Amino acid sequence: MLNAEHLHVARDSGVILRDLSIRIAPGCVTALLGRNGAGKSTLLGALAGDLPAGGRTRGATVRGDVALNGEPLRAIDATRLARLRAVLPQASRPAFAFSARDIVLLGRYPHARRAGALAREDGEIASRALALAGASTLDARDVTTLSGGELARVQFARVLAQLWPSEDAARAPRYLLLDEPTAALDLAHQHQLLDTVRRLSRDWNIGVLTIVHDPNLAARHADRIAMLADGEILADGAPADVLRPDLIERCYGFRVRLVDAGDDVAPVIVPA
């Protein structure tokens, strides 16, 4: 379990997260919804270990507790933490002409038997991760020449390579934190990526927290949905329980209605 208890984050501009608690369970995909500036990326950063609790860091005062598999996050060294959780931040374009394969191989360095020395197995994992991400054809491409969507798929392959199950601990609980992974993707690749995330969460026993802006995507691909508003968790539960017009309006300040899509999966959310 990756969990935050009574997490409180404040900056000079004001309070961002207010005494917030959330749990990310292995084998489960949790989608985090909220309007722009609600604190979603801040919460993800705290769960990733980028904003350690217990003082002031990166211009923020952070209080509360974050634990991974029962161990305080701040007690886990950087290499071991990188083996247990992977983070896909919002898109950032590399400044140097690495190949897509080079980027994906970055996810394997925490697993290197000797510092900085990768094995043949790591190259094989990189190839398989690129295939899972639908990016095999980009293998040798210079990442500075890729489109936003192509780069997003390569970076997704990187975090898959980082969490690739080892033979001796194939189902050890690990965690994947995704910050708007579908923002640059077309419709087909949005669903393909989230389908892959949900399948691997079960097959690899990974707990996933993914920030998404489209509640319709969350309804179809998440096991749980957490809504963040005014620095607090407004709702947290199964999509059918959380995606109600009244809660969506409180979350986004926007009135919606639910339309039956006729596929017994989830209703479609449209403007009221």
Swiss-Prot record:
It is found in: Cell inner membrane. One of its GO terms (molecular function) is ATP hydrolysis activity. Disulfide bonds: none annotated. The keyword Cell membrane applies. Pfam families: ABC_tran. ATP binds at residues 34-41. PANTHER family: HEMIN IMPORT ATP-BINDING PROTEIN HMUV. NCBIfam families: PRK13547.1 (NF010067), PRK13548.1 (NF010068). This is Hemin import ATP-binding protein HmuV. The gene is hmuV.
